[in-house]
Structure formats: C-alpha cells, structure tokens
C-alpha cells in the first residue's frame, strides 16, 4: 500500500480586490471595493469583490449593476437609521441624505448612520500577474517547483508529503508559515485546505474553511481526510459547492433522488451501472469523489496532455453589434488566431465559430426563431454555430480570415444583433512547412505570405501588438487596438478607480 500523502490547496482571498486595496494602502479585509471596468456599462462583470462588500450579499462575480442595486438597498435601510438618530441632513429638495459616507467596514459598523460607499477599481491584469509571480516565489522558498501545481492566478496545489519531516512541522504549521509570509510580503490574506488527496484539500479550502472562524489576519485553514469528509460533508448542500460538480450534473443526479454526496455514495453501492449509463466514463470520477477518493496525484496532473489540441479566442462585446460590424470583429479575431498559430509554429485543420445574439432581439418583440436560456435565465435567440474545414492544415491569414468571414455570413441571421463571439482553431499540429498544392497553386505567394506574417509578428513582439495594424482596426466598432492592450480580455493597467456612494 502506498504511503498516505498530504496536499495543500491555497487560495488568495479576493485576490484582485486585495491587490487594489493594498496598492491604495487600505486594509483588504475592511475596505469596500469592486474590481470592474466601469468605462464599459453597468452590465460588466465584477472580477472581484472585497470581503467586507461580500458581507452585504454581493457575490464575487456579480454584474456591476447588481452591486450598485444592492448598495442602494443597503443605503435605503441605513438612511432610515440616520433619520431616526437625527444624523441625516435634509436637502433643498426636502429629501433626507447622509451627512457622511464611508467605504471602511469598521467605520460603518461603528456608526449605522453612515452611508455605505465603495471604490470601483479598473482591472490591472499585468499588476495581478506580477503579484501572483511574487507569491509563487514565496512558495518556492519552501517547496520544489515539481511539487506545486498553479491551478489559477490565485490558487495553487502543493504536495507537502516529503517536506513535513524535513521541516519538523505538521501540515497545518507549514501551511500557516507560508500563508503568513505571503501576508507579510504582500498584505494579502489566504485560505488553505489540507487533505489526504487533491480533491479533499480543495474541499477543505472551498467548503470547510468558510465555516470556521478566521484568525486576526483573516486566515482560515481546514483539514479533511476520507473519514472526516464523510462525517462533515456527506450531508452538505448544494452539490454545486463540490469541485467539478456543475449544475448540469446536479440536475441529472436530482432526477434520481440524489441531493448530497452521501446520497451518491449510497446509490453507487447498488446503482453503479445506472450511473455509468447516465454519465459514461465520468461516473468513475463522481463515485470516487462521493467516497472521498482521488487517485490522481501531482505527477499525474503535471503530465496530463489533452487528446486533442485547439486554440480559441472569445469576447463579449460591450454593446449589441449589427451583423456587419460583428463580421469585422470576426475578421479581427481570426487575425489574432493567425498570429498565435504563427508564433507557436502550429497549423489548424478547421475553424469553428459560435455567435451569441443579444437579448434585445427577443425583448423588442417580433422574433419568432429558436431560443435558448442564458446563464442568467434570460431568453435569447439560439446561438449560431458552424465549422469550416480546410483542404490542408494552415495558419495563413488569407485562409483563416476570409474563411471565417464566409462562415459568419453563412451561419448568422443578418437581422439580429450580436453580443458574443468565440472562434476556435481545431486540431492544431506542428507546422511542418508543407502545402497542399495543385497545378494552379502559387507556392511562392504562399511562402511570401508566411514570411510576411512572421515579420509582422516580430515587429509586434518588439514594439507592441499595436505597432502593426490593418486599416480596418481603425473602423468604428473595431476592438483589436483595445484588446491588444488587455490581458485575458481585461485591462492590463488602469487608473486609481472611482469612489461610489
């Protein structure tokens, strides 16, 4: 029997919001702040919400308008308190207003008559990457890179099995040591989970740690093994709180009377075959997780390679785009794919395009086509979807851009406005330098185009992505210039933010 291993999962608390608070010399735990690009619209997603603002039941990935509305509701209640305490002021319009507001939780808790305010900080993705790198280097002071798996910009898994006897520490002590050093160096608090496998470490962090008191610095550390997992979490609801258990899976489980992990474990004793009928090979993962098992360790997840490779570009447009303007965006996105393939020396066999329509097409009335429900429960026209396959794998812009535009024309309804576009380069493989040719193929022209792409890529890498642009990128509605200044679809750097009352 293999020796029991010990894993840590560490998550930086409200990471983007915490970075913004620390850079403003504000306490991340008591400052009301959201990270969102208010220059777009109030429909924009909040990338992060500070812990003190989450306390007002504002979710971490709310739309900005949802945060604005919730703050209005809170302030309506607080204003009544201010009026009763004779601390509100009456304006010339005869209405009462707050005499003062604050974005600090301590001040707001001390004086219920204060108005709730908050800071809207524009995202600065490059800054977050820099801080994440700094924190990763802190972990490397204690463990080898071979024993760390960065799960995201703000979350890591660490196999600490061999380090506990070396440092003469328990897993809790080592986790606290690393978390404390991160806090000292960056001002950012973290939550940690300890488990006998990766799955249990993740659940200890995601679920159990949230229900235990934090220390004076806001740090929470929880532990799980297979037995404590069954005792603490077999009756936990909802199932969507569990790692890798999405809403679709939960709906199918509930049809069979399965509402908890305990239900699933008991069902699997006699109903294993039925689970495989419903979920296929994914049933194995569900059953293992129901019992608290996870066979994959650090070596397995680091060596994993997907069976097929693809490269994708996607964006949600800031407003509804008419069909002709949306086609311009598709051409720009295909060009970005071209440069990504060229840089990685890859070619693709086909392009898949998915176009999501705006809900205004339904709201205005008159639309009678197929519909679907978006993630917010709203009715929208059914998305357009299509694929174009090439005669031979390619990364040439003349093919990718023109064929993507033709595909867009073929699959979309020109009468509908567009809000979301995703384009995928499928089955990418190394570029061997070969062309599919016939008597009419001008191979010199193809080679010239490839060299031009490589030259343009070199200029972009040296002088910036906007150093070489097509004239179409200066047309109204084009987004290439803006997106070239972004990281992950969000601003790489921004202003200091605005105070909202």
Where are these regions (language model features)?
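A short glycine-rich, hydrophobically flanked beta-strand micro-motif that places a catalytic Asp/Glu
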Residues: 190-194, 349-353, 419-421
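Non-catalytic surface loops within mature trypsin-like serine protease
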Residues: 162, 196, 357, 392, ...
């Amino acid at each position: 029997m293999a020796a029991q291993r010990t894993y840590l999962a560490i998550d930086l608390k409200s990471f983007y919001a915490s970075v913004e608070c620390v850079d403003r010399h504000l306490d991340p735990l008591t400052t009301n702040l959201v990270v969102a690009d208010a220059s777009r619209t109030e429909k924009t997603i909040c990338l992060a919400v500070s812990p003190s603002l989450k306390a007002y039941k504002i979710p971490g990935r709310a739309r900005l308008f949802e945060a604005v509305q919730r703050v209005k509701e809170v302030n309506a209640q607080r204003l009544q308190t201010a009026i009763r305490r004779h601390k509100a002021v009456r304006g010339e319009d005869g209405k009462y207003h707050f005499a003062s507001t604050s974005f600090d939780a301590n001040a707001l808790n001390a004086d219920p008559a204060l108005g709730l305010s908050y800071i809207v900080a524009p995202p600065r993705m490059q800054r977050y990457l820099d801080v994440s790198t700094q924190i990763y280097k802190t972990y490397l002071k204690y463990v080898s890179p071979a024993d760390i798996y960065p799960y995201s910009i703000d979350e890591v898994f660490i196999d600490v099995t061999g380090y506990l006897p070396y440092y003469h520490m328990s897993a809790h002590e080592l986790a606290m040591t690393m978390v404390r050093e991160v806090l000292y160096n960056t001002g950012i608090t973290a939550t940690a989970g300890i488990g006998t496998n990766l799955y249990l470490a993740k659940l200890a962090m995601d679920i159990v740690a949230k229900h235990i008191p934090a220390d004076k610095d806001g740090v929470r550390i929880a532990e799980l093994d297979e037995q404590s997992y069954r005792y603490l979490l077999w009756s936990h609801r909802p199932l969507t709180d569990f790692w890798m258990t999405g809403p679709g899976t939960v709906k199918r489980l509930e049809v069979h009377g399965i509402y908890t992990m305990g239900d699933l474990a008991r069902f699997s004793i006699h109903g294993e075959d039925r689970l495989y009928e419903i979920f296929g090979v994914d049933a194995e993962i569900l059953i293992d997780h129901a019992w608290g098992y996870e066979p994959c360790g650090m070596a397995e997840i680091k060596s994993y390679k997907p069976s097929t490779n693809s490269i994708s570009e996607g964006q949600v447009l800031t407003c509804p785009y008419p069909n002709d303007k949306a086609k311009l965006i598709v051409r720009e996105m295909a060009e970005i794919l071209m440069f990504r393939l060229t840089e990685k020396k890859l070619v693709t066999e086909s392009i898949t395009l998915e176009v999501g329509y705006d809900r205004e097409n339904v709201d205005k009335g008159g639309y009678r086509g197929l519909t679907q429900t978006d993630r917010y429960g709203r009715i929208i026209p059914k998305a357009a979807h299509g694929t174009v396959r090439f005669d031979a794998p390619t990364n040439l812009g003349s093919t990718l851009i023109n064929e993507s535009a033709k595909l867009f024309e073929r699959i979309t309804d020109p009468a509908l406005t567009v809000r979301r576009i995703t384009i995928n380069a499928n089955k990418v493989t190394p570029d061997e330098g070969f062309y599919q040719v016939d008597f009419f193929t001008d191979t010199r022209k193809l080679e010239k185009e490839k060299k031009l792409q490589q030259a343009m890529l070199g200029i972009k890498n040296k002088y910036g992505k906007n150093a070489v642009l097509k004239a179409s990128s200066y047309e109204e509605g084009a987004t290439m210039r803006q997106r070239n200044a972004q990281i992950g679809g969000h601003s790489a750097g921004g202003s200091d933010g605005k105070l909202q009352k």
